[in-house]
Amino acid sequence: MSNDFISAESLIADPGRVYELVANAAALGPRLPGSAALRRFEEILATGFAASGLTVELLPYTVRSWVAREWSLSLGNGRPDAVVSGYYPESGVTALEGTTAPLVYIGTVEDADVIDDEIRGRLVVVDYPLRQMPLGYPACWGVYDRDQRVVPTEWEHGVKLWVPLEELRGRVASAGGVGLIAVWTGTCDVEVMGLYEPIRPPSAQKLLAETTAEGKRRYRPHPRTELPAVWVGPSGRDELLAAAAAGSEATLKLCADVHEAAPVNSIVATLPGMTEEAIVLVTHTDGVNALQENGGSVLLAMAECLARLPLESRRRTIVFACVTGHMCREVFEVDGKTPTLAECEGLLTQRPGLAAVAVAALGVEHVGSTEWVREGAEMIPSGRNGWAHCLTTSETLADVMLKALEGTDSDPVLVADGPIWSLAYPFSEVGVPSVSYGGLPAYLMAITPDSYLGRISKVRLSAETNALLRAVRALDGIPQIAH
């Protein structure tokens, strides 16, 4: 039985197929939790996997669907309305006419001084700085970049202060504040326009779970604070702080369509091999634009290709898991009342035997990104691809990924020995050798009219998909993979 790498031509008959799938998903609009767009995307994936002969299973959940429809900040007293760059998801809602109250500025999110008498009945303004943050990878397994660029040492999207901001929002609500206005600093309006942040606080699924004394994983209750909040770009800071210093009133409006117990599903599609040993490919279904998240489209394209191979050429079973709940504060059981674990924590909870047969797990997200750089008050394309990050603690997996990338248009990719993030993390925690793969550009979380489809490189998208296919074929032939 041969497990040699398979060429792109052999696996992707139509070079535009992956892009077509991504474009079709982007045309649905933001796939927010519980939205009609997400439900339609789930249908596309389930139907597509089944059409290729895979066994498809749906793991049902419910979520609180919270879709904003109108948001603004009017300063009054002849001042121009503030340019609101976005809203804080699931923060809270105002009446249709908005909430009018005096403004008060309390400093920076990390050291804001919340004094009840100064907060009560006011709209609270706080600075939210965008700072550089070191990557912090312990070691680098290798770099695939034919241009031999300088390897990045900092995260492109900077520090995310989601946790202190959420904690501050709770303190402001407890002190009687009626709204929160977070002002971006250290960036430009264009860079932060439309950002859907935070996707949930805390920002990692692992923080929504805990281990019991019996060694079982369970949901960790997460309190919800109903306090409407919006983001303002840096160009509006001076006017906003001047209004606050003058004790002026402003009107904050944040209206949303809220539906409890909206149905969602994780999709598990299985392509059988000659043995029960499994290679697991994971991504999430919910996302805000063509880049975040296009992993489901990539996995479907991979499944279509791999399903064309004869069974006897597939030693191991391949599991494609497109999980839900990545962008939710809470996910519930189908009763709509009982909080539960979702994403891959939920997958492993509902399918405890999966970890025992999994020989490797590959988390696939944010494929095909291009590089955009800040130039003054604008963001412009550099004409190059953005860096992709491939993280694994396994030297074997690092070697597989570097060889799979070689000779493709996937670069630049940094393959590092670093903490497994996001979807592959739960597999790594239970001892399954894992890889986290994806780009992390600053525009990753933006909702835009064109879904940032134009920031996807068709060439790179196809190349990365092919590299991942090559990696899967290589993993199929390795007898044992060290964690």
Language model features with spans:
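Noncatalytic luminal/extracellular "stalk/propeptide" segments of secretory-pathway proteins
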Residues: 2-3, 12-16, 20-145
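Second-shell loop/turn segments in exported
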Residues: 5-12, 26-36, 101-105, 138-140, ...
